[in-house]
A protein has these predicted regions:
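Bacterial N-terminal signal peptides that target proteins for export
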Residues: 1-7
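C-terminal motif of bacterial Sec signal peptides marking the signal peptidase cleavage site
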Residues: 15-19
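Secreted glycan hydrolases and related glycan-binding modules that recognize and/or cleave
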Residues: 20-288
Length: 288
């Protein structure tokens, strides 16, 4: 009889445990705001209008554990986003879905960005191998031509990242710090990119379209905006004024304050402040 009592008790407890739902379910604490098609059309129209733009570098979007590190968490009013965290892998479909929504629906321009130092690149790249071989040549016209070709290959390396990933342009971070790709060499590199993007006065739209089609094929060349991608220089000073005609913007790293445009037109200079610095202060440097 005692045995039966123990068995019944065990069955009761087992039944109670079996009836518990142990599935982990996420709770919807706060639903994101949603907007209609007209809102997004108005947003895109605004970004196409003549206005003072909002620009920012964005990184750390690999975590996805907070709206603060997601593309959908970016302000709707942001005109241009420079993808400082790198280009996500194509397998990361969730991030790419957000990128495309922000890019195509909200109208935010997505830029590939890189610190352009050819000496710092690894030797496994074809452009770096060509560069190393060119540098080893004796001085003369052949060496200059070989170096220029390596700069073109380096430019094409970044062009591929923009066009193959359907991004909206390139942010060339010009901080040479002794790198060979500085001064006139950087200018040559930049102007080669300018054949494919940016406001190049030396090339017609038809010529640019032909170049894009020759390199990437008709499918990519026929995409909306393929001839209108942006080319920007990102620097700590207002040097390289020779590139003004080929640049949409100069992203000036004015982290310590100051708003001197140098020889650059005011409408092409975007003054940038690192909001992560001096976070305990009043951000007064943004307005000096």
């Amino acid at each position: 009889m005692k045995t039966m009592k123990y068995i019944l008790a065990a069955l009761t407890v087992g039944g109670m445990m079996a009836s518990c739902n142990t599935d982990i379910e996420s709770l919807t604490i706060q639903r994101p705001l949603t907007y209609d098609d007209q809102y997004y059309q108005n947003l895109r129209d605004y970004k196409e209008s003549d206005h003072e733009i909002a620009f920012g570098w964005f990184a750390q979007y690999g975590a996805q554990n907070s709206a603060a590190v997601r593309f959908m968490g970016l302000p709707d009013s942001l005109d241009i986003c420079s993808m400082w965290g790198g280009i996500p892998s194509t397998e990361n479909t969730e991030i790419w879905e957000e990128i495309r929504f922000v890019q195509k629906v909200k109208g935010t321009k997505m830029l590939c960005v890189a610190i352009t130092r050819i000496d710092a690149e690894t030797d496994d790249h074809a452009f770096k191998q060509a560069y190393n071989e060119a540098k080893a040549m004796p001085n003369g016209e052949e060496r200059t031509a070989a170096l220029n070709r390596s700069f073109e290959m380096y430019a094409e390396y970044f062009l591929d990242q923009v066009f193959l990933n359907d991004l909206d342009g390139f942010d060339a971070d010009y901080e040479p710090e002794g790198d060979f790709l500085s001064g006139s060499n950087f200018e040559y590199f930049y102007k080669h990119m300018a054949k494919y993007m940016g406001p190049n006065p030396d090339i017609t739209r038809e010529e640019r379209l032909q170049l894009i089609e020759e390199r990437y094929g008709k499918e990519i060349a026929s995409r909306e905006g393929s001839c209108d991608k942006m080319l920007n220089i990102d620097q700590t000073s207002t040097s390289m004024t020779s590139l003004i005609p080929y640049s949409n913007y100069c992203f000036l790293q004015a982290y310590g304050g100051g708003t001197g445009a140098g020889g650059w037109p005011d409408e092409k200079v975007v003054y940038c402040c690192n909001m992560g610095d001096n976070w305990q202060g009043d951000m007064q440097s943004m307005y000096n």
